[in-house]
């Protein structure tokens, strides 16, 4: 009986991280907030907001290095495939538009994420990890890359 109780306790404790993860992923509006990401020497902050239609948008609002070293001026979105957006400052780029919550999978997706370094858009899905970070997986033609956004309090 003692072994059974120990095994049951171990199983219950093993399930705790999964339940904590699914709790954060179980409500669509949990994604709303501010996040930061560091990739190599690049660092930026993003704010996720809710659109009037119930979808979500992620927009850069801060960059570690907003100045283009070649020009000495604010860095612009020069690789954007939409030529009308190439004069937009990089610290104002909308990375994700119309992100939808998919309750059956407890993820956000059915949207594109924009990569300003490459000037491409990719399919994106997002979910919270056990440690609270937001995991965003972008895929183009089956090739994927994952970035992590850490929640910030300001």
What are these regions (language model features)?
Residues 1-4:
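Positively charged n-region of N-terminal signal peptides that target proteins for export
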Residues 7-15:
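Bacterial N-terminal signal peptides
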Residues 21-34, 144:
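N-terminal helix-cap/turn-to-beta initiation motif at the start of protein domains
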Residues 32, 37-38, 43-117, 121-123, ...:
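Central antiparallel beta-sheet cores of small beta-barrel/beta-sandwich binding domains
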Residues 81-87, 134-141:
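Short aromatic-glycine motifs in intrinsically disordered, low-complexity regions
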Residues 123-127, 132-133:
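C-terminal terminal-subdomain/extension
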Residues 131-133, 139-154:
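Edge beta-strand at a domain terminus
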